[in-house]
């Protein structure tokens, strides 16, 4: 949960509720190098989303691709984002230049793991699944975040209200489940 974040689109300022999803990467890159840190831990990659379930929302599109089927209206109403914790997927990652000119790896697509790969066996996850909610912050988890992520959360009106600085906006209600059948897809 990143709280409500200010962004600009087509010259207009917007304030939208944002979330971040992260994935632990397993496997090798295009050159055959293991996807690990210098310590040998799996690399991780993250993608920020607007918390929106509209038909064109990137969050909904990626989740539907991950499930390999669209959500019904009923599934969308009861979808709980936490049901994806620990669910395996395949990612399409592309290089993209940042505003500072540096190249970054961005998640372009999410897909289910093909059954032939599942049947061969998936590696065990190394890092624990974690959820951070501004409404009920885990301060120990918050302290593990990098400076940039902390600053982003701290600038949200929800965090400001929690710290007694400003009034929080009305909360955006997220629907609940739809990944209950993730293992079967």
Language model features with spans:
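Short beta-rich binding modules
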Residues: 1-185
């Amino acid at each position: 949960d990143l709280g409500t974040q200010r962004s600009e689109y087509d010259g207009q300022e917007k304030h939208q509720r944002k979330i971040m999803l992260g994935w632990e990467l397993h496997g090798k890159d295009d050159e055959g190098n293991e996807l690990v840190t210098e310590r040998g831990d799996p690399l991780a990659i993250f993608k920020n989303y607007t918390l929106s379930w509209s038909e064109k929302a990137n969050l909904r599109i990626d989740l539907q691709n991950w499930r390999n089927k669209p959500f019904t209206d009923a599934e969308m109403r009861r979808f709980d984002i936490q049901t994806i914790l620990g669910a395996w997927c395949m990612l399409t990652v592309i290089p993209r230049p940042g505003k500072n000119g540096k190249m970054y790896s961005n998640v372009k697509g999410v897909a289910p793991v093909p059954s032939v790969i599942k049947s061969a066996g998936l590696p065990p996850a190394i890092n624990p699944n974690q959820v951070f909610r501004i409404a009920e912050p885990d301060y120990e988890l918050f302290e593990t975040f990098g400076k940039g992520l902390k600053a982003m959360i701290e600038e949200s009106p929800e965090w400001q209200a929690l710290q007694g600085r400003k009034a929080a906006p009305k909360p955006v209600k997220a629907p609940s489940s739809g990944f209950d059948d993730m293992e079967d897809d």
